[in-house]
Amino acid sequence: MADESSSPATGDPNSQKPESTTPISIPNPNPNPSLTPPPPQQHSQPPVAPLVPPGPPYAPPAQIPSSLLPTNLPPPPPFRPGMQFTPVANFQNPSSGVPPPGSMPQYQPQPGMRPFQPMANGYPGIHGVAPPGAMPPHGLLRYPSPYPTMVRPGFIMRPPGTIGAVQLAPRPLIPGMPGLRPVMPPMVRPASLPFVTPAEKPQTTIYIGKIATVENDFMMSILEFCGHVKSCLRAEDPTTKKPKGFGFYEFESAEGILRAIRLLTQRTIDGQELLVNVNQATKEYLLKYVEKKIETAKKAKESQGTKENQAEGPESEQDKLESADNETGKDGESKIKENIDIANSAVLTDEEREADREAMEKIETAIEERLKSNPLPPPPPPPADGSGMEFAFKSKDGDSNTDVARSDAAANDVETSGEHNRPDTSSPDWSKRNDRRSRERGEKEQEMDRYEREAERERSRKEREQRRKLEDAERAYQTRLRQWERREREKEKERQYEKEKEKEKERKRKKEIRYEEEEEEDDDDSRRRWHRAALDERRRRQLREKEDDLADRLKEEEEVAEAKRSAEEQNLQQQQLDALRILSGQAAIGSETVQTSPIENDHKATLQTVGESANEHHAADFEENGSGNESMAIDNNSGSEAHAPSKKLGFGLVGSGKRTSVPSVFYEEDEDEARKAKKMKPLVPIDYSTEEQEAVAHGGSGNTPPHLALAAEFAKRISSTNPKEETIETEKQRSRRSHDKASHRDRERERERDRDRDRVRDRGDGHSGPTKDAKESGKAKIIDTKFLDAKQLIDTIPKTKEDLFSYEINWAMYDKHQVHERMRPWISKKIMEFLGEEEATLVDFIVSNTQQHVQASQMLELLQSILDEEAEMFVLKMWRMLIFEIKRVEAGVPVKSKA
């Protein structure tokens, strides 16, 4: 240690550089180079440094001019107290391979003191002040300090080092080298202070498993019976948000862990045996704690045994100590290191045993209350391999064994004493004491055997009880498990039944919706057909009424014209009669009347017949239509009045009969009178026999005047020619009208049949057999097929599924005209509509099947697996299109753009 400053490892690195030839070229950081080392002192004198203020700086030597002094020197170093070290005795300097330089003879440091006094600014100083003309020692530069005098605070020197130790030697001064720093010994920890191991952090965390059904609060309450719990860490399942089946609990002391291991190992909660374990760090901590506790108990018992057994002598104490050491070493330490259950190896006092018993009672009470209040859910099954049972038995075996070992060690510890009081075995009373100790040891062994037998019986009883509880719990669990499985099966069946019911309801609902949609479509179709039929019926009725009105109007006009002609003819006849009366005179009135009565009667009978027939026909039409023209009624009345037949008054006398048909003031007759007049029997003219006419002719032929004969001849000619011609013409007109009316009725009847046939075709009544008129019209249509258009062809195509599937298709015409090429675009378009994308393969498949002349039912079966529910609709539409194309080809109808 004395040569530490001179070693190359601790020396200044500048000491290895070559010597400089120009000492003033490198500025020296030492501002005071004129200091000299202190003179040697005697060892008897105390090392006291005089507190003398520093003197003025030395003047520069004469050989160094002032111009060569440095002008820009660094500022002085700041005030910095130097480090102070205490020398360490017997310090060996590490060998670096370079021997230290020898010490100079002219400088001998005082023993026990440092070579230089530590200064506040870090530079070494000397004791005392050199005189003004003194030369500095070798190795120090001789140049003046550019700084003013520094006032250095004085301080009391340290006491000398340890007596007998090698002191420090200064490094030899080398000329031309800057000054060295003071040699400071290394700072070493005082040897008197003992090494203190840092306090070990207690590892008091315990792992408890198989607590999946146990709440954390209940687990904390159970652990509080063992000791205070500082913290707990129990993870939660992220899906169910329930705590997992294990947890980490940190106790405040190691006693809590030991008690928890003793009381909770293999403890059954909710049908599961708790798994209590510690990690390696906690196990080591517990081992140390148990060893320390055993050691403390041993020392305490040794001290107690020393006080109690001093009267027996040192020999007995030494024997007890040896036996205790041997037995404890065998039964205590070996079992602590070998036994997994560390807690059972701890030395328990009476208070700790009482605390364990109370904690055990509290834990059992809490578990029983939990079983009563919360029997469900059933506990999970125990491990199948039975490792838990074996571990429980092993742990309990360990408990009993360690208890026996502890009792044995405790009994031996009572008799032990200190090692230093062991007596000599040559004492005369040693044999007696040895015999007494053997007897006592035998009694203790017998007591230990008895205790072991009792412990074994107790352990067997506990094992049987535990096994019985486990079997009961297993049976209860199996029973509950079977009940739970039965309930779950029933619930699953109910769920399946509910699902089937829901599916059935859904199927029924879809079927009802589809049926309602079809009903609505059918209702819409029937409503449209009914509406169309009603419109057609109304249109036909209106047309029929218009035609009837037109026919009635024509008939009325004809009747009016006929009545006018009849009136004109009657007026003409009246004029003729008046002329005849004027010509014949009053005397021949009777004879003329007699002669002309047959002719007049014939003529009047004809007119009466025509008028009555006209009036009757008109009245019937009036009643049938329910309406009539007032003016026409007036004309008819006037006509009837004009044509009113004259009543026969006797042979050849005829009355006018106008009184019976006199109109009322308003030219209207009462309904009863009009009905009676219409229902009156028409008058029939009297036919005279030939004998009567000859008698009348012979009676008046002799004295007939010539002018009367001329007038009679004229009237006869008129009556014989006019009525006949008029009658023929009237008959012709009547036959023409009847013919026109019959032809009109035929045309109307034909149109009515056509409309009925169209209505039946619109309704789709294809199953009804065709009537005779339909067959005739069908023949006419077959003849005129080339004049039909696409609309009429579409109307002839069947609409129902049965009719379409039973329709005979002309496949020869299909193959001849290659109808499949015309069908291909339509099929591709419909497939695009049904599937949403083009399927060229499916289109080719359908076209190829139609070329093979498959039936509609076969085509439906082929497409059923591809189009599902839409297959039937597609086949129906395609078959209608196929029939239309074949019919169009047969009829030669060109394709229209809209078709």
From Swiss-Prot:
Post-translational modification: Phosphorylated; the phosphorylation level is repressed by abscisic acid (ABA).
Any one Gene Ontology molecular-function term assigned to this protein's record: RNA binding
PWI domain: residues covered: 802-899
Example of a GO cellular component annotation carried by this entry: nucleus
Basic and acidic residues biased stretches: 317-340, 354-372, 430-505, 533-568, 723-733, 740-778
Annotated motif Nuclear localization signal 1, positions: 526-533
RRM domain sequence ranges: 204-281
Region (Disordered): 1-112, 298-572, 611-778
Sequence motif Nuclear localization signal 2, residues: 735-742
Swiss-Prot/TrEMBL induction comment: Induced by abscisic acid both at transcriptional and at post-translational (pre-mRNA splicing) levels.
Domain notes: The PWI domain binds nucleic acids with significant help from its N-terminal flanking basic region. It has an equal preference for binding to single- or double-stranded species, and it contributes to RBM25 role in modulation of alternative splicing.
Function: RNA-binding protein that acts as a regulator of alternative pre-mRNA splicing. Negative regulator of responses to abscisic acid (ABA), including in early development.
Protein name: RNA-binding motif protein 25
Organism for this UniProt entry: Arabidopsis thaliana
